[in-house]
From Swiss-Prot:
<keyword id="KW-0106">Calcium</keyword>
<keyword id="KW-1206">Fibrinogenolytic toxin</keyword>
<feature type="disulfide bond">
    <location>
        <begin position="163"/>
        <end position="168"/>
    </location>
</feature>
<feature type="disulfide bond">
    <location>
        <begin position="272"/>
        <end position="292"/>
    </location>
</feature>
<feature type="glycosylation site" description="N-linked (GlcNAc...) asparagine">
    <location>
        <position position="312"/>
    </location>
</feature>
<feature type="disulfide bond">
    <location>
        <begin position="240"/>
        <end position="263"/>
    </location>
</feature>
<feature type="binding site">
    <location>
        <position position="216"/>
    </location>
    <ligand>
        <name>Ca(2+) 1</name>
    </ligand>
</feature>
<keyword id="KW-1217">Cell adhesion impairing toxin</keyword>
<feature type="binding site">
    <location>
        <position position="295"/>
    </location>
    <ligand>
        <name>Ca(2+) 2</name>
    </ligand>
</feature>
<feature type="disulfide bond">
    <location>
        <begin position="228"/>
        <end position="241"/>
    </location>
</feature>
<feature type="disulfide bond">
    <location>
        <begin position="322"/>
        <end position="372"/>
    </location>
</feature>
<dbReference type="GO" id="GO:0005886">
    <property type="term" value="C:plasma membrane"/>
</dbReference>
<feature type="domain" description="Disintegrin">
    <location>
        <begin position="214"/>
        <end position="299"/>
    </location>
</feature>
<dbReference type="GO" id="GO:0090729">
    <property type="term" value="F:toxin activity"/>
</dbReference>
<feature type="domain" description="Peptidase M12B">
    <location>
        <begin position="10"/>
        <end position="206"/>
    </location>
</feature>
<keyword id="KW-0964">Secreted</keyword>
<feature type="disulfide bond">
    <location>
        <begin position="121"/>
        <end position="201"/>
    </location>
</feature>
Length: 418
């Protein structure tokens, strides 16, 4: 499974935000600024393609009236404010994997940008900020690719790191001879991060209707108006696709997809994806499409020897969640521990409404904070929780988890399984 994950194409669904100073800097022209932002993302996509990562612009926001955070010269303060705004505002409006702020402000010192290491897919940490430090857009694009590299688990290159050029993307300082290449160290760091964290959001391919940048034939994304996109005519190896037009060649039904074989749809009933577990189903081709639609067992079907119920293709049970948080010997705490969820304090609650924490009703206590017993010799406390103010949702009982016979958690309530 690990190898399958590593080999899979990755997609970063990006929202790019420009602050008010950027709007003023480009003459209050939304068209001029948008064009610059599109050009930057096209370069970033080109840079990451060598890593089997495609960057799709799914949102573009220009703060043309006023800034939505206080953008200041202290890069770490601005990053913290931008990341909090992304989590509490942007994510609620627009589904995406990563957000970058392009600012016209001068950061203190030699800093051209800042981002959280290994933050991708995390609500609070999948963010970066970049100064529009050069008129040449591809130099700004390299700086933004550098910050996204941090989000994807890459650290700064050391002197021993090589990429075959004078300077690599993850060099610690800006170079007058930058390249689009990642070093051997960056590749190792990224791979180690993928193995450790296995971020799931970057496996989801964006729909062509999600991409907001103008279609570019040759960027490996099938966008509105295109039937296929296999890269430039020089690099395309796809016999089904005409790289010059991004249209299917004569007689071809498809160019890619699990139900596409040698430019033709696979026959109806052909298995295209095996069932992963008891809550999944084997997926079959329809004979009319190249897509392999992911199907799973109905929600509420008993699983794991009746210890749980299927929920969106998974079988969430509390013990597995405790193991994920506290290690292989962890167990679910006794029922008395869950009474702390009646308090409605900063960690013991069932749900949040307008950022206010709502205490659990007595029948819902198993749908709030998860209480675990780590089972290590040093542990005396029978009621352990995972709580981080930066990611308050982590450590809550997952939706769909069995909370009583015939009942599962939904929005912090223990409701009948239907």
């Amino acid at each position: 499974e690990q190898q399958r994950y590593l080999n899979a194409k990755k997609y970063v669904k990006l929202v790019l935000v420009a602050d008010y100073i950027m709007y003023l800097k480009y003459g209050r022209s939304l068209t001029t600024l948008r064009t610059r932002m599109y050009d930057i993302v096209n370069i970033i996509n080109l840079i990451f393609q060598r890593m089997n990562i495609h960057v799709a612009l799914v949102g573009l926001e220009i703060w043309s009236n006023r800034d939505k955070i206080i953008v200041q010269s202290s890069a770490d303060v601005t990053l913290d404010l931008f990341a909090k705004w992304r989590e509490t505002d942007l994510l609620k409006r627009k589904s995406h994997d990563n957000a970058q702020l392009l600012t016209g402000i001068n950061f203190n010192g030699p800093t051209a940008g800042l981002a959280y290491l290994s933050g991708i897919c995390k609500p609070m940490y999948s963010a970066g900020i970049v100064q529009d430090h050069n008129k040449v857009h591809h130099l700004v694009a390299i700086a933004m690719a550098h910050e996204m590299g941090h989000n994807l688990g890459m650290d700064h290159d050391k002197d021993t790191c090589t990429c075959g050029a004078r300077s690599c993307v993850m060099a610690g300082t800006l170079s007058c001879e930058p390249s689009y290449l990642f070093s051997d160290c960056s590749r190792r760091g990224h791979r180690a991060f993928l193995i450790k964290d296995m971020p799931q959001c970057i496996l989801e391919k964006p729909l062509r209707t999600d991409v907001v940048s103008p279609p570019v034939c040759g960027n490996y994304f099938v966008e509105v108006g295109e039937e296929c996109d296999c890269g430039s005519p020089a690099t395309c190896r796809d016999t089904c696709c005409d790289a010059a037009t991004c249209k299917l060649r004569q007689g071809a039904q498809c160019a890619e997809g699990l139900c596409c074989d040698q430019c033709r749809f696979k026959g109806a009933g052909t298995e295209c994806r095996a069932a992963k577990d008891e809550c999944d189903m084997a997926d079959l081709c329809t004979g009319r499409s190249a897509e392999c639609t992911d199907r799973f067992q109905r929600n509420g079907q008993p699983c794991q020897n009746n210890n749980g119920y299927c929920y969106n293709g998974t079988c969430p049970i509390m013990r597995d969640q405790c193991i994920a948080l506290f290690g292989p010997n962890a167990a679910v705490s006794q029922d008395a521990c869950f009474q702390f969820n009646l308090q409605g304090n900063h960690y013991g609650y069932c749900r949040k409404e307008q950022n206010t924490k709502i205490a659990c009703e007595p029948q819902d206590v198993k749908c709030g904070r998860l209480y675990c017993f780590p089972s290590s010799p040093a542990t005396k406390n029978p009621c352990n929780i995972h709580y981080s103010p930066n990611d308050e949702d982590k450590g809550m009982v997952l939706p769909g988890t069995k909370c009583a016979d015939g009942k599962a958690c939904s929005n912090g309530r223990c409701v009948d399984v239907t």
